[in-house]
Amino acid sequence: LILTQMAAAEEATVYSVVSTDEKEKLAYEAGATKVFRYGEDLAEQIKAENGGGVDVVYDGVGQDTFAMCLNVTRPRGLVCSFGSASGDVEPFKIQELNAHGALFLTRPSLKHYVATDDEFLMRAQAVARAVEEGTVKIRVHPPYSLENARQALSLIHI
């Protein structure tokens, strides 16, 4: 939801993909332009919405969505795989990126973006400023007991 809020604040067209009605509502509240549900024809639905795919995909799911991410990205677009909620992406032939239109692929890690004290401070200040200005709203849930850990974990994935 934070990424959606930040992209929407920059006036990007934001497509979110979710699995439940509640997550759909949250995505729209965060600024998503259009929300889709996981399904077999997801890439085709998104391409139909904007006439040919997206420039950038941010994927926190991993294994279950990686092929769709490649299919929905426009030629010379960027796929940013930052999570593995469904498991790690299987090894693949790098030529796949060319077959989908000379795509760029990255797997960022926070430690590489806060490698120095100056970088850390700059990024921390940017996040704090976004929260102070109301660009990013952080949802805080009440604490859950250990018996309700499964319920608490179900709330952290969009």
Predicted regions: what is each one?
Residues 1-40:
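Mid-domain Rossmann-like dinucleotide-binding core that forms the NAD(H)/NADP(H) cofactor-binding site
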Residues 10, 18, 64-135:
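Glycine-rich phosphate-binding loop and adjacent beta-alpha segment
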Residues 32, 53-54:
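Local beta-strand N-terminus motif with an aromatic residue
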Residues 42-51:
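Short amphipathic alpha-helix with an adjacent loop that forms part of the alpha/beta core around
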Residues 57-58:
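N-terminal Rossmann-like NAD(P) cofactor-binding module of classical short-chain dehydrogenase/reductase
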Residues 127, 149-152:
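Non-catalytic, hydrophobic alpha-helical segments
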Residues 156-158:
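Conserved small/polar residues in nucleotide/adenosyl-binding loops
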